[in-house]
Curated annotation (Swiss-Prot):
Entries under Pfam families matching the protein: ABM
UniProt: Fe cation binding residues: N6
Cell compartments where the protein resides: Cytoplasm
Gene coding for it: isdG
GO CC aspect terms: cytoplasm
Source organism superkingdom: Bacteria
UniProt name for this protein: Heme oxygenase (staphylobilin-producing)
Amino acid sequence: MYVVTNRIDVKKGFAEKMAPKFTQGGKIQELEGFQKVEVWLIDDEADYDQMYINTWWDSEDDFKGWLKSDAFKEAHEGKSKTKSDDSPILGNKVVKANVISELS
């Protein structure tokens, strides 16, 4: 299993407004190896919200297929790489990991 986490820092109060956009469903669900998406709001005392958007895949290759897909392009169209003062997004970091041990 392969898990990708996009850690996104947003202005305080915006995480709960933005979270449904990541879990509304769509073409990602039809892609080979896709398992699920979860959005977490990190519980801390920061002056900003930190969201973790976690996607689970059967393999790294399946995740790479998502990155190359039309579904990925459609999900991210209109997103500017340049930050504006109006954007609630303060920054992000993507973390990729192979699950090497699990207890269910």
